[in-house]
A protein has these predicted regions:
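Conserved phosphate-binding loops in N-terminal lobes of ATP-dependent enzymes
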Residues: 3, 7-73, 80
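Glycine/GP-enriched mid-protein hinge/lid loop-to-helix segment characteristic of carbohydrate kinases
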Residues: 3-7, 19-21, 28-32, 39-42, ...
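Residue-level signal for pocket-adjacent positions within structured domains
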Residues: 28, 72, 79, 85-88, ...
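Glycine-rich phosphate-binding loop and adjoining helix at the ATP-binding site
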Residues: 36, 41-50, 64-69, 76-134
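Short, small-residue-rich loop/turn micro-motifs
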Residues: 73-75, 172
Length: 173
């Protein structure tokens, strides 16, 4: 049974964060895990991610299945937002089709985006800035990333990384 929540995942170079989001964007059942231990070996990252998602859903089975899964990656994506092209801090996630194989394994819709775009969307909502004409978000984690939104649309550029400051590893990140 699908219910009115979305499973959100933030795949970072150090941690994977997961949680249930309801229709009011409230976060519940937050979980944090190690990215390198789950995805770092690169042997079957889609299988590992599918197993992680299934385990999360089993742990929260009283909520039923999510309506969809939304995943943010610290990556360059293809224009269709179905494939990871480059993920410097997680080498096993380079040139990797994500949405189609995960949808087949999980029988749920899967959406991916750059993690910084999803972080900026959250900040726009939390700070009531949805109508702002130009917004730039800079985010620090394992690396440094940024997102630019102009007139309600993300600035992606020809290769999906317009304005990107780069995947710069930070000491202690």
């Amino acid at each position: 049974m699908k219910t009115d929540w979305v499973l959100g995942l933030d795949i970072g170079g150090t941690h994977i964060r997961a949680g249930k989001f309801d229709s009011e964007y409230r976060l519940e059942d937050f979980r944090i895990s190690s990215s390198p231990s789950l995805l770092g070996r690169g042997e079957d990252p889609i299988g590992a991610l599918a197993a992680y998602i299934r385990a999360y859903c089993v742990d929260h089975s009283e909520a039923g299945l999510p309506r969809a899964i939304s995943i943010g990656f610290p990556s360059t994506l293809n224009k269709e937002k179905t494939m990871l092209l480059s993920t410097p801090n997680l080498p096993g996630l380079n040139v990797l089709s994500v949405t189609e194989p995960l949808e087949k394994k999980l029988a749920l819709p899967v959406f991916i985006n750059r993690d910084v775009n999803l972080l900026l969307l959250n900040d726009l909502h939390v700070h009531h800035l949805e109508q702002a004409e130009i917004v730039i978000g800079c985010y620090f984690g394992t690396g440094l990333g940024n997102s630019i939104r102009i007139n309600g649309s993300f600035l992606n550029g020809a290769h999906g990384v317009a304005g990107e400051l780069g995947h710069i590893p930070l000491a202690g990140g």
